[in-house]
Amino acid sequence: MADSKLLAPELSDAESMGEETVRFQELLLKASKELQQAQTARPESTQIQPKPGFCIKTNSSEGKVFINICHSPSIPPPVDVTEDELLQMLEEDQAGFRIPMSLGEPHAELDAKGQGCTAYDVAVNSNFYLRMQNSDFLRELVVTIAREGLEDKYGLQLNPEWRMLKYRSFLGSISQQSIRSQQRPRIQELGTLDTHDSLGTRHGPERPHLNLWLEAPDLLLAEVDLPKLDGAQGLALEIGENRLVVGGPQQLYHLDACIPLRINSEASRAAFHHRRKQLMVSMPLLSASS
């Protein structure tokens, strides 16, 4: 993910960062305060009642396992991409695409034969669920992500083989779930700021438009607009502890943003959104004590 050639020596000089960095720091710190105030002013979570969708059957070493795939309008939808775009992202092993879902607690149930089993409720966005109903590909993807999420959360080892129940949309009863309720404060788009390298007399790579926001106190997201590109081929990305550097193929783009937060570069991920022609970057933040 790193390419040290992208770091221009003159940009490492604090004096060259100029007014843009100062304004950026003010905007980012303001957004951090807004997020903290929002968390104080409202409950961190809200209760939702998912609606039934479909139920799949699999198993673990401890017996039968059923997963109720549910939906709720309160769950945020994933980024709107076509199946072709999503398939290409997955083939390129990019981790920028996420399907928000709520993983419920295990509950003991009885199957059709009256034998004991375990059921889990997994909720996704209602509009996305409607789209998933007409797509075997999305259904397979959601089940795979749900299964892996349950394995990670509860230390399970589930059989990847599964089948969907024909005549039951859920097993047992679907309980309420708690989801995070805070909104993400947008940070002013840096592409609109006046910078020395955006003056009309400047020649060389174009500085792309950058959007940043705090998804949570420990997660910073970025969108870099690259309208001249059709894919990620030739893109160079470097993420430092407080630096985001993007270089385009054939010197089309160059972005060097100093971020006054500590980024976990090892855990950061990026994906190219083909329809929007954007580079999406997910950057977990390090705690002050780490």
UniProtKB/Swiss-Prot annotation:
Q: Does the keyword section mention Nucleus?
A: yes
Record's comment describing the protein's domains: The N-terminal region is required for binding to phosphorylated substrates while the C-terminal region binds to the other R2TP complex components.
What protein family does this chain belong to?
Belongs to the PIH1 family.
Q: Which residues form the signal peptide?
A: none
Instruction: List the GO biological process terms.
Output: box C/D snoRNP assembly; chromatin remodeling; epithelial cell differentiation; positive regulation of glucose mediated signaling pathway; positive regulation of TORC1 signaling; positive regulation of transcription of nucleolar large rRNA by RNA polymerase I; rRNA processing; snoRNA localization
What terms describe the molecular function in GO for this protein? Answer: ATPase binding; histone binding; histone reader activity; phosphoprotein binding; protein kinase binding
Name by which UniProt lists this protein: PIH1 domain-containing protein 1
Q: Where is this site: Interacts with TELO2?
A: 57, 64, 113
Q: What is the lineage of its organism?
A: Eukaryota, Metazoa, Chordata, Craniata, Vertebrata
InterPro entries recorded: PIH1/Kintoun_subfamily, PIH1_N, PIH1D1/2/3_CS-like
Q: How does it assemble?
A: Component of the R2TP complex composed at least of RUVBL1, RUVBL2, RPAP3 and PIHD1. Component of the PAQosome complex which is responsible for the biogenesis of several protein complexes and which consists of R2TP complex members RUVBL1, RUVBL2, RPAP3 and PIH1D1, URI complex members PFDN2, PFDN6, PDRG1, UXT and URI1 as well as ASDURF, POLR2E and DNAAF10/WDR92. Interacts with phosphorylated TELO2 and mediates interaction of TELO2 with the R2TP complex. Interacts with phosphorylated ECD, EFTUD2/SNRP116, RPB1 and UBR5 and with RPB1 in a phosphorylation-independent manner.
For this UniProt record, the keywords arranged alphabetically read as follows: Nucleus, Phosphoprotein, Transcription, Transcription regulation
**Function summary:** Involved in the assembly of C/D box small nucleolar ribonucleoprotein (snoRNP) particles. Recruits the SWI/SNF complex to the core promoter of rRNA genes and enhances pre-rRNA transcription. Mediates interaction of TELO2 with the R2TP complex which is necessary for the stability of MTOR and SMG1. Positively regulates the assembly and activity of the mTORC1 complex.
Q: Which Cys-Cys disulfides exist here?
A: none
Q: Name one GO cellular component term.
A: RPAP3/R2TP/prefoldin-like complex
At the top level, the lineage of the source is Eukaryota
User: Phosphoserine (modified residue): where?
Assistant: 12, 16, 173
Hydrolase keyword on record = no
Can you say where in the cell this protein is located? Nucleus
